[in-house]
Amino acid sequence: MREVATGVWHWKAAHPEWKPGQKWDRMVSSYAVDSGEGVLLFDPLDVPVELRERATAVVLTCPWHRRDAPQLGLPIHVPPPDPPDPDPVRGEVFRGGDTLPFGVRAFEGFEPNDLVLYVESRHAVVVGDTLIDRGNGLEVHREWPGPGVAAEEVVHRLRPLLDLPVDVVLPTHADPADRAALERALSL
């Protein structure tokens, strides 16, 4: 675990469902952010003890990033489930366009329930599956958008982030990055 910016922590863990040959890396990132109102865990997996003890809530970027969230015993904020999900994550459902009570704004990513989150107090952008790094820096994941969703449409949805102060970008399928990486990813 390392502090990548004041009040922002990053760690990696092996995803338990990963199998050789999958198009994403076995090691995935999780984050903790001190929002000023509490410590939020984003897409948590193998949370370090010192952060688990301070955490006040879990925020998921997408419902399939449940990881360790249900076992932490914390309030969970989750995008709507994929129908028909036989075992949806139980929690407070939020959508693109919503602002959570602790200053996290949600932007729709490549699907209505894959959200890109802006943590106002830390000028941080948290990204689930919409932006990934496959060795060329952050980019819109061109293979995962839903049917009929073009990468250009996803970029258009996320461009308002460039009007906000962004100091750090926190992708779950890459290492933390800076504003310049976000600008490059959204410059189709």
PLM regions: where:
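Metallo-beta-lactamase
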Residues: 2, 6, 13-16, 38-41, ...
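Pre-active-site segment of Zn-dependent metallo-hydrolases
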Residues: 10, 16-57
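Active-site HxH/HxHxD metal-binding segment of metal-dependent hydrolases
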Residues: 21, 45-100
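A generic local structural motif
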Residues: 26-29, 44-50, 64-69, 112-114, ...
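Short glycine/proline-enriched coil/turn segments at helix->beta-strand junctions
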Residues: 36-37, 52-56, 72-75, 102, ...
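A contiguous pocket-lining binding segment that forms or flanks enzyme active sites
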Residues: 89-120
